[in-house]
Amino acid sequence: MRIVLGIESSCDETAAALVATDRTILAQHIASQDEAHAPYGGVVPEIAARAHAERLAPMIEAVMQEAGVDYADLDAIAATAGPGLIGGVMVGLVSAKAIAMAAGKPLIAINHLEGHALSSRLADSELEFPYALLLVSGGHCQILLVEGVGQYRRLATTIDDALGEAFDKTAKILGLGYPGGPAVEKLARDGDAQAVPLPRPMLGSAEPHFSFAGLKSAVLRAKESGDHEDADIAASFQQAAVDCILDRLQVALGGDDWPPALVVAGGVAANQTIRAALEGFAADRSMRFVAPPLALCTDNAAMIGWAGCERLDLEQDDPLDFRARPRWPLDPEAEPVRGAGVKA
């Protein structure tokens, strides 16, 4: 058994974790910045970076002490090196480099998206390659075929906004505050998903990509009309999102040879309505459905540590001069898609 220290600081969660190659999470801490960013309705990069700088070092010491592990006991240090808010990414990566240099341990620079892509393998030892992945978060919405560690084939992406961003915008329109995803999901439980006629962008298109900008605009018009209850708007928005997801999956993956498993990851993967719809979609096509525990859906260091474990087993480490990357696609060979390269 080998131990990896994982560090995550790409957005507004500061996190550190110790993860073993036998899938044991020895210790993990996470500090959210929701209260700091709530007055602004979204993440302010400067505030996020400052909070990471204040919290990360004592957090790392805390997980080391909790697990009873010394730096000499570590086998590698893994840190998110992108994509993300560059100030926060640099805080975590520089800290990882310092520890790696001082302890004489390998540095493993992790693509934050790869952390999400592999997170279900931390929780499920039976999940093997290949599998289809729906990656849905505040900054990304992609369908990928995961063929191995570092082997990702992008099948679809968003041409404008990510689904998590659409949830946050809907929450703001409805006065629900930040973060918006959980608030919209909660309000939607009291609404009628068929009450508000909202568009399903790209539905029926032969192209597999997503689009949510038009859906956001339609939510705003529905609210401004004064003709609908907020709960009905939330429920109708959520149902429109589900319909778009299932249609895009059908186009991206459809054929005679479905992947053996469908995995969902990212912050939006915590949405229970979306999970249930995906589970039904997979069952109808004889695919196994896998979703990580809720704690591994949002940004966390355990998934970064696990991605480090996966790469450590393959003897893949990185030089200490590895530079932070604000944009870092999982599939660098994927053809450019209009609007899709903005955040990855």
From Swiss-Prot:
Transmembrane segments: none annotated. Fe cation binds at H112, H116, D299. It comes from the Bacteria. Coiled coil: none annotated. Its EC number is 2.3.1.234. Its cofactor is Fe(2+). It catalyses: L-threonylcarbamoyladenylate + adenosine(37) in tRNA = N(6)-L-threonylcarbamoyladenosine(37) in tRNA + AMP + H(+). Keywords: Acyltransferase, Cytoplasm, Iron, Metal-binding, Transferase, tRNA processing. Binds 1 Fe(2+) ion per subunit. GO terms for biological process: tRNA threonylcarbamoyladenosine modification. GO terms for molecular function: iron ion binding; N(6)-L-threonylcarbamoyladenine synthase activity. InterPro entries: ATPase_NBD, Gcp-like_dom, KAE1/TsaD, TsaD. The keyword Metal-binding applies. Required for the formation of a threonylcarbamoyl group on adenosine at position 37 (t(6)A37) in tRNAs that read codons beginning with adenine. Is involved in the transfer of the threonylcarbamoyl moiety of threonylcarbamoyl-AMP (TC-AMP) to the N6 group of A37, together with TsaE and TsaB. TsaD likely plays a direct catalytic role in this reaction. Belongs to the KAE1 / TsaD family. This is tRNA N6-adenosine threonylcarbamoyltransferase. The lineage of its organism: Bacteria, Pseudomonadati, Pseudomonadota, Alphaproteobacteria, Sphingomonadales.
